[in-house]
Amino acid sequence: MEQRYATSPEQVPGMDTAELRRRYLVEDLFAEGEVHAVYTHHDRVVLAGIVPTGDALDLPTFPEIASTTFFEHREAGIVNVGGPGTITVDGETHDLAHGSCLYVGRGADGVSFRSADPAGEAGPARFYLFSAPAHTAHPTTLVEAGGGTVRELGDQLTANRRTLNQYVHENGVKSCQVVMGVTTLHPGSTWNTMPAHTHDRRTEVYLYFGLPAGDRVVHLLGQPAETRHLLVADGQAVVSPSWSIHSGVGTAAYSFVWAMAGENQAFDDMDGVPVAELR
């Protein structure tokens, strides 16, 4: 598990490209046959990528979280961004197709991951886990791809028409603080979350997927009057502290998992920034 300490907005103007990427971009989250994890001290979020290619992969109990089991004091939302697979929690096995989401609550044990057909055309499952501390237990719940609360956003004329699926949220699958969903851009649209906004009470992470290998998303971050950018590839994640905008434009259409943790779960608790005020 890699640890990343929290940063302040005053640090960003002095960062070069390499430091921006080291602080906020998670490049090597998915590796076949392995579990890769990052612990960010922004709201104590843990990100993990799990890619089973043979036997089932167990979720480790990382020493950095100082718990008997991973879920002793935590909850998580998990989205499969690869081929079909299964997650076993407390002896019960859940089938996850591409884009499906499983919420796992505090106190869960015996969590393992398996690909249905790692050598098949769809390839191995790629499970993306987003975890935050939890004070109480909620039941493990599966949401099929395309389910949850659906919002149609944007317009083809502004190249930001997209479908947003809310999976784990205050009016959907219950959790302590994790909020999670998937947004998919329509063909011909390339912008996400523009006009941009910040969440002064929550950390948010974007995981980009479904992006062709030769394409990139130009992801904007930083305070609205002091923005920077990252070039992001398929399967990479960007950590957005509470003070940072999070928006991007791709060289092709794509999807992304958005997930938040912090003070509250209100989806619309955001501070909008007019485009003309960005710098």
From Swiss-Prot:
Belongs to the KduI family. Coiled coil: none annotated. Binds 1 zinc ion per subunit. This is 4-deoxy-L-threo-5-hexosulose-uronate ketol-isomerase. Its EC number is 5.3.1.17. One of its GO terms (molecular function) is zinc ion binding. Zn(2+) binds at H197, H199, E204, H246. It is an enzyme of class 5 (isomerase). Pathway: Glycan metabolism; pectin degradation; 2-dehydro-3-deoxy-D-gluconate from pectin: step 4/5. The gene is kduI. It holds the Pfam family KduI. Its cofactor is Zn(2+). Catalyzes the isomerization of 5-dehydro-4-deoxy-D-glucuronate to 3-deoxy-D-glycero-2,5-hexodiulosonate. Gene3D superfamilies: Jelly Rolls, pectin degrading enzyme 5-keto 4- deoxyuronate isomerase, domain 1. It comes from the Bacteria. Keywords: Isomerase, Metal-binding, Zinc. It catalyses: 5-dehydro-4-deoxy-D-glucuronate = 3-deoxy-D-glycero-2,5-hexodiulosonate.
